[in-house]
Amino acid sequence: MITEDTIRDVWEKAGIVDGFAPTMYRRDACGALIMRDKYGKVNPYGWEIDHIYPQCMGGDDQLDNLRAMHYMNNRSKRDDYPSYTAVVTFDGTKNTQKMRNLTVNETTRRRINELYQNR
């Protein structure tokens, strides 16, 4: 279950963007700009909590398996792992739609493997 504490902790893990207040703005794993108060909203800066290792594959709500992701990137990622499609990125002034194929980085994949290797 996602609690307010979890939302806060996941937000704190998201990337800091130079020139933007980190209490209000962060960058998701796909490079999209997200705003703290837009959690759960369909908005140009809205975001959701992504399960890096999808729940349908045995992933759960451990903080190491969670990350902030722009809602459109999360929806395009679906249950794909480790490779997935992202559709929004930040161009330095605003979010723009740009389809890209991405892969969860090696460090994160090793951590996920340690968490879920026996499942």
Locations of the language-model features?
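Acidic beta-to-alpha connecting loop that harbors the catalytic carboxylate
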Residues: 73
